[in-house]
Amino acid sequence: MQAQKAEGTRDLIGAEMRAWQKMQQIAAGVFEPFGFKPIETPAIEQVDVFVHGIGQSTDVVRKEMFRVFSGANLERVFTEGTDIKLKPKQRLALRPEGTAGVVRAVVENNLVPQGSTPFKAYYAEAMFRGERPQKGRLRQFHQVGIEWLGAPDPAADAECIIMLMEFYKRLGFDLSKLRLLINSMGDAQCRPAYREQVKQFILDHADEMCDECRERAELNPLRAFDCKNDHCREIMAEAPLMGDNLCDECREHYEQVKRYLDAAGIEYVEDPTLVRGLDYYTRTVFEVEAPGAGVGSIGGGGRYDGLVELEGGKPTAGVGFAVGFERALLALQAFGSDLGADEAPCVYVANAGKELRQNVFAITQELRAAGIVTEADYQGRSLKAQFKQADKVGAKLILVLGGDELAAGKVKVRDMESHDEVLVDLANVVEAVRERL
């Protein structure tokens, strides 16, 4: 049987791999001038990192998180099932998102901001969720994101959004085709009472709503705003709104965020029903949609002022966002653009006989040492076949070394497009190639 990749995963090959690399390069170019430095956390974390951070009642933890078993524990799973009792350090999961792991790393490595020095980091990593595979929704996907700890001021919320929109611009998006949604989810002071209002509203309309919304009424009532059932959405349009229940501090924080965005010329739409699927969010939340692209949200984030404490650290403000690579790429393509990075011009070095391979080998090493992408024949092809191979790999130049050229200390350089040929000194081959690329 032919080996196949797991369902809901993709191989990043060729143009897609170059696109992922380009997104990472753009991320560094946008985020580092703002003071953010790269971070990488393990793909495997203890389950409690996500249970405490994302929330036990969220769909991510309850339905989508991949559990990891190894060694003897895997044998027990086969015989006893997945509900086997394990020590906390043995209860492992693949990361479904980036924020909780970064915060865990900050707490564990004693990097929690002290005084006026914040912690700023960005990441570009694979995430894993056990969702039903479909367009823009994979079981292994990639995200670029930032985390900013120690910044309680609403200016930090606005700056994150400004960075996010600049990132989309650098990716090649026409920002007029994107829609930025913002809302406030309140905080630990005002949200519990609002949560109870929404819960009661759902219970009052339980006979008209889907099974999932009825279940959410007890576990996570705010998630009912995200229901895809059209009838449920019509009902939830009449539900109480967080904006009408914000405490004075949360309302002022939200108003200041909007003033900063207005001053920066950032266009946004207030969506009073916008909620994020993770429990750690507080106050400002935001999402970016690409209407017409057919992929839904292509990124989002918000404030999470209680997450560091949930992961065992001191109370610390935090804000961040993440952008999905696969969805962003699909949206770009839907708008007639792409993220494929241009490949460096290639040079092909051909030989006119097996006895010249050692000399060709030396030329290829010299060109590669100079940073020039170079291919050569190692399969004993004829000179005609080598020309065909040079065309196949997209070489801009082909260097042909024959016995006469070698005796004269020369090599023939041919432009594959114009077919112009010139003899150049072997001693100056790097400079000659660079001039023609």
Identify the function of each model-found stretch.
Residues 1-437:
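TRNA-recognition modules of translation machinery and tRNA-sensing kinases, especially anticodon-binding
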